[in-house]
Amino acid sequence: MNSDQVTLVGQVFESYVSEYHKNDILLILKERDEDAHYPVVVNAMTLFETNMEIGEYFNMFPSEVLTIFDSALRRSALTILQSLSQPEAVSMKQNLHARISGLPVCPELVREHIPKTKDVGHFLSVTGTVIRTSLVKVLEFERDYMCNKCKHVFVIKADFEQYYTFCRPSSCPSLESCDSSKFTCLSGLSSSPTRCRDYQEIKIQEQVQRLSVGSIPRSMKVILEDDLVDSCKSGDDLTIYGIVMQRWKPFQQDVRCEVEIVLKANYIQVNNEQSSGIIMDEEVQKEFEDFWEYYKSDPFAGRNVILASLCPQVFGMYLVKLAVAMVLAGGIQRTDATGTRVRGESHLLLVGDPGTGKSQFLKYAAKITPRSVLTTGIGSTSAGLTVTAVKDSGEWNLEAGALVLADAGLCCIDEFNSLKEHDRTSIHEAMEQQTISVAKAGLVCKLNTRTTILAATNPKGQYDPQESVSVNIALGSPLLSRFDLILVLLDTKNEDWDRIISSFILENKGYPSKSEKLWSMEKMKTYFCLIRNLQPTLSDVGNQVLLRYYQMQRQSDCRNAARTTIRLLESLIRLAEAHARLMFRDTVTLEDAITVVSVMESSMQGGALLGGVNALHTSFPENPGEQYQRQCELILEKLELQSLLSEELRRLERLQNQSVHQSQPRVLEVETTPGSLRNGPGEESNFRTSSQQEINYSTHIFSPGGSPEGSPVLDPPPHLEPNRSTSRKHSAQHKNNRDDSLDWFDFMATHQSEPKNTVVVSPHPKTSGENMASKISNSTSQGKEKSEPGQRSKVDIGLLPSPGETGVPWRADNVESNKKKRLALDSEAAVSADKPDSVLTHHVPRNLQKLCKERAQKLCRNSTRVPAQCTVPSHPQSTPVHSPDRMLDSPKRKRPKSLAQVEEPAIENVKPPGSPVAKLAKFTFKQKSKLIHSFEDHSHVSPGATKIAVHSPKISQRRTRRDAALPVKRPGKLTSTPGNQISSQPQGETKEVSQQPPEKHGPREKVMCAPEKRIIQPELELGNETGCAHLTCEGDKKEEVSGSNKSGKVHACTLARLANFCFTPPSESKSKSPPPERKNRGERGPSSPPTTTAPMRVSKRKSFQLRGSTEKLIVSKESLFTLPELGDEAFDCDWDEEMRKKS
């Protein structure tokens, strides 16, 4: 730079400082220490806006311009000092430094990664984490030398590029042409303090969370001088503004010169207390305030929205997500009167079998936390977790480990049990005292580790519930007692759970979609950063519950002495504060205390009241408010706090009454998910607004019932409104009959997947099994598309599936046909809404199902004819048998209940009865069939073996679904219905039974008395509407079936039930006689039912079947790999007993 440029830059900067930083300079002038170094922080954006020319010079010559800035700053300070009226109170300071910050955000000036060689000489902003700090040194930056010949005295500055070494000139720099090369250092053995400055080197590393997988974080040294020394410590996140420079050792002969890139810092900004680039303005806060205002009447539903957005790729696991969210929210750190610091961070340990999603939670938590470190136990040592002493350039320095780097953040440790024994003890202090004391290589210090530890581990071998957690995972009690929560995830090998998880994974793989209801990762990160600023205080009611629970834990006979100490009470307080933060509150209420006690009871650290829980199969509740009410009743009764219970129940009742009419418009618009559709027959669907219902259907997150939550928005018809009170009455009666079991988390195995058997009583005359069998099969052809199990059909609601919906791929050619179906169904629904009917449903406890099944089988063997009640009307059409939806019921463990529900009559075609019982005993199985592809017309039905539907009054419907969906060790054939449901059905066995009087039979059953064909009975119902099923028969040639549909809308369970049965045509013989009895049941041969046809109105469809080698296969164009929805009862089968029966 020439003199004119230097003058211009100095004048502009001096005027800028005098205008914008006059107050800062006045404060500096009032300081008493004249030798100290004082910074003046200047915003680069404001400076460059004042004069763009300065910005150009600054980018081209940063070192020279910074020196000019310091000189201009001293002149400006002198000018301000002279302008003061009372200069006695101030003094001039010579060590003033201009610190540049706030560079324009562009890739040329702001870097998140370590600079490279091309950046040398540029002024940059670099973000990183401090991993090493050296000792503060004294640096002599200039010396005086005198020429021995001419006695000329000159000053030599230390060369930064050569590690601040002094390089003597080759000749005397005097103007008298002295060519002497001998000089004498005037400084001698001691240096003047004015010629020395503080000097420190730190080492920064790229932030791990900003790196891609497999990238090794790079590091570089940063030079700190003057006032920047000791401005940071190991583990701090920094934004450093400085000049990228290179330096090398002095040259030596025959030694390669090693050049090192360093950053000479001009200004350091510590980001520990900031949100790492997350903007927290009023608009963002207002957005979250509006969110909670929307869920003011049901705050737990709003909380579940957040929980469902936490790690959405993992299905269910409601309890684990709640615990992780509470740990991420964190408690409040306190310092008592004696100076002892009580930690506010909670620690969580996930213990589970392989494949239970532990690592997924750790990875997601590390992503949404600004300061996080993810490591594994097998790859970590005590030094790697705490602090390391390293020797560099002949001196020892301390290098921070994972816990120090995660200070004020999150440290995730996977495979926690892989830590060596002596390494585990090293983190005891870091977990409880939140500090690490080091005495290594003569360096004694204490570093902060105010971090939350989220660890995951596998049990040692098979988890034994009879043993303690310490024995199962081989970790010591002192270490386990430092974890606030220990959740156990046991893989119980539940077939229903396996089916749901596999369907969830496969559906997401095939049809990935982005939800509009779930929160994005950026929104989650912003929310958790925002709530950590809240400081909730404990209320008296919350204190009372936590204190009473702590006392109960201490008095428990099976208590863990190492756990039930004062640490338990502190853990309860921390978790209660964390839940209050999660709920966006500044007070810890009774709701927070009840939730914390319930979570603690479900962990291995609790269990004094109700026992531990397997957290793997916990699911999102259908109604969070009702779940909380059950928690209150159970916990407060156990804690003997009846006054709080009665007061809380009154508060909940008032809140519910206030929100009834306020939420009515919103309730009608909310979509019903499979969780809320689990009602009895004819009962209206519960239109609730829980988070699982409002968001999970958008992203196809499956409910524990196994159905994708993707139903379109459905407005209930007007005739459903009067039945809401009835539903609430039954809900209250059901709640009064509950036992004190820990089922508020709606376990997969009990709450959502244990359907009860029911008995249906119809007021209409009973028809024979054959008539009932022949009148219902035609309804299976009422649409090309079937909904998945537990999900409403697209034909039912008159809407097309979205491209992101799972189970049914997008087909543009279905648009027109579906529109017509929607109009027809809506008009028919309005007509059928006025037809009254009544059905009584009785739910049988699970422990009676086996007994009922045995009695039903015994009665079936003794039966020789159709009961007399099954009379055939003289007219060709009769009322249908109403079949309530078992799979969509909402059963509770060991709680029988009865619901009165309404259905409408329908008219059907019937056929003469037969004698199915004798045929069942004579029937045999057929060989496994082969797969043949055919593109014939939709209504083509290939010839194949026939099946007989036998009248059996007490055959359990649980066996029906089990045998229909699980062809284990049974020859049969596989049939794919238009709903893409693949079901395997053994030939010759009956899976449908007709209605029987409830006074004789406990479980609900249906008998199909069809002697010559295998037919199923669908249910066409929505609310109080029922449909008229139509006759469908199968022949050995193409048949066209049509009929008039009187139904309103098809129930989701109807389609799931249709998928469980096969449509098989009669054999070519067409013999109407019953099949002859075979001596060897191992022989296989088809029976010969007659071929019949019936009219059909709706469009034709294709089917997918596995048949014999001579049979043709008709394949649907739709997805073929969606499994039917089955309840737990479908899997309760003793296959050894079944095989013995067959043999």
UniProtKB/Swiss-Prot annotation:
The keyword Plastid does not apply. Changing K358A: Loss of helicase activity and DNA mismatch repair function but does not affect the interaction with MCM8, MSH2 or chromatin. GO terms for biological process: DNA damage response; double-strand break repair via homologous recombination; female gamete generation; mismatch repair involved in maintenance of fidelity involved in DNA-dependent DNA replication; protein localization to chromatin; recombinational interstrand cross-link repair. InterPro entries: AAA+_ATPase, MCM, MCM_dom, MCM_lid, MCM_OB, NA-bd_OB-fold, P-loop_NTPase. It catalyses: ATP + H2O = ADP + phosphate + H(+). Residues 300-505 form the MCM domain. The modification Phosphoserine is found at S762, S802, S1109. Residues 687-701, 768-782, 868-881, 974-997 have a biased composition (Polar residues). It is found in: Nucleus; Chromosome. Its EC number is 3.6.4.12. One of its GO terms (molecular function) is protein-containing complex binding. Residues 656-738, 755-815, 868-916, 942-1011, 1063-1105 are annotated as: Disordered. GO terms for cellular component: chromosome; MCM complex; MCM8-MCM9 complex; nucleus. Residues 726-735 have a biased composition (Basic residues). Keywords: ATP-binding, Chromosome, DNA damage, DNA repair, DNA-binding, Helicase, Hydrolase, Nucleotide-binding, Nucleus, Phosphoprotein. Residues 783-795, 998-1011, 1069-1084 have a biased composition (Basic and acidic residues). ATP binds at G352, D353, P354, G355, T356, G357, K358, S359. The keyword Membrane does not apply. SMART domains: AAA, MCM. Belongs to the MCM family. PANTHER family: DNA HELICASE MCM9 (PTHR11630:SF48), DNA REPLICATION LICENSING FACTOR MCM FAMILY MEMBER (PTHR11630). Component of the MCM8-MCM9 complex, which forms a hexamer composed of MCM8 and MCM9. Interacts with the DNA mismatch repair (MMR) complex composed at least of MSH2, MSH3, MSH6, PMS1 and MLH1. Interacts with MLH1; the interaction recruits MLH1 to chromatin. Interacts with MSH2; the interaction recruits MCM9 to chromatin. Interacts with MSH6. Interacts with the MRN complex composed of MRE11, RAD50 and NBN/NBS1; the interaction recruits the MRN complex to DNA damage sites. Interacts with RAD51; the interaction recruits RAD51 to DNA damage sites. It is linked to Ovarian dysgenesis 4: A form of ovarian dysgenesis, a disorder characterized by lack of spontaneous pubertal development, primary amenorrhea, uterine hypoplasia, and hypergonadotropic hypogonadism as a result of streak gonads. ODG4 is an autosomal recessive condition. Component of the MCM8-MCM9 complex, a complex involved in the repair of double-stranded DNA breaks (DBSs) and DNA interstrand cross-links (ICLs) by homologous recombination (HR). Required for DNA resection by the MRE11-RAD50-NBN/NBS1 (MRN) complex by recruiting the MRN complex to the repair site and by promoting the complex nuclease activity. Probably by regulating the localization of the MRN complex, indirectly regulates the recruitment of downstream effector RAD51 to DNA damage sites including DBSs and ICLs. This is DNA helicase MCM9. It comes from Homo sapiens (Human). The lineage of its organism: Eukaryota, Metazoa, Chordata, Craniata, Vertebrata.
